[in-house]
């Protein structure tokens, strides 16, 4: 039996994707639309308390293309807090005009593939803590996609010896390090939580960097032989002060 990699787990994660029902929304009186937007602004402002107290974070982006219009990403210490946030959001008046298109449930994850041996408690390491319980960047662009490690008769990631997997992940990670300062990456584990095994969320002020890193990694053995991917979502940041313009008709 192949040895399982150990993981460090941080905040729980919920990506929510919505399309706006513009046809119905435009039928609402302007005063009512403005009241809905104000209610949404209040909801988001209330969630900044978690960021300020370092008990979670969130990000909101306008998705490009027809897969969705909005992405709301929330991080919290407990899964039930994500349920509470989603339930609260669904009860907003404006939610009546938002059509759910996709969601992803996971948890911020670090694996031990690249970790050295140490007696130190990794959860007390400042660098590790910053990655498990992050403050999300306010980058111009976001990219999200789910992925699996392939497991079939020809290529099965889970049957490889752990030392082979460590070597492959080391080489894979070296490509990612070339994009340090250009891309901020967050890996969330979702085995047993959602339909794929991991979610990958990338932030950058240069949207072209997403294409560059994903393309370059296609030639890495870890991806070429063992990577399987879901849909890609690209978006531009949507700040609270942008809500009125975004929802204006």
From Swiss-Prot:
Coiled coil: none
EC number(s) on file: 1.3.98.5
Pathway given in the UniProt record: Porphyrin-containing compound metabolism; protoheme biosynthesis
A molecular function GO annotation: metal ion binding
PANTHER family: COPROHEME DECARBOXYLASE, HEME-DEPENDENT PEROXIDASE YWFI-RELATED
Function of the protein: Involved in coproporphyrin-dependent heme b biosynthesis. Catalyzes the decarboxylation of Fe-coproporphyrin III (coproheme) to heme b (protoheme IX), the last step of the pathway. The reaction occurs in a stepwise manner with a three-propionate intermediate.
Name the UniProt record assigns to this protein: Coproheme decarboxylase
């Amino acid at each position: 039996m192949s040895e399982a990699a150990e993981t460090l787990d941080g905040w729980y994660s919920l990506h929510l994707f919505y399309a706006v029902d513009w046809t119905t929304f435009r039928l609402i009186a302007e005063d009512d639309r403005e009241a809905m937007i104000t209610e949404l602004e209040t909801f988001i402002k209330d969630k900044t308390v978690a960021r300020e107290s370092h008990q979670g974070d969130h990000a909101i982006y306008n998705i490009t293309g027809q897969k969705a219009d909005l992405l709301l990403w929330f991080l919290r210490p407990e899964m039930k807090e994500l349920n509470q946030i989603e339930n609260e959001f669904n009860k907003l008046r404006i939610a009546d005009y938002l059509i759910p298109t996709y969601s992803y449930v996971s948890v911020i994850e670090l694996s031990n593939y690249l970790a050295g041996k140490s007696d130190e408690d990794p959860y007390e390491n400042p660098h590790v803590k910053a990655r498990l319980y992050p403050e999300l960047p306010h980058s111009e662009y976001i990219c999200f996609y789910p992925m699996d490690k392939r497991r079939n008769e020809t290529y099965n990631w889970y049957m490889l010896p752990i030392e082979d997997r460590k070597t492959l992940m080391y080489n894979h990670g070296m490509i990612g390090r070339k994009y340090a300062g250009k891309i901020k990456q967050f890996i969330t584990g979702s085995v047993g939580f959602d339909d794929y095994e991991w979610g990958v969320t990338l932030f950058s002020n240069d949207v072209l960097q997403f294409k560059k890193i994903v393309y370059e990694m296609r030639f890495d053995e870890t991806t070429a032989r063992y990577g399987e991917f879901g849909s890609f979502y690209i978006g531009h940041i949507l700040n609270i002060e942008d809500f009125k313009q975004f929802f204006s008709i």
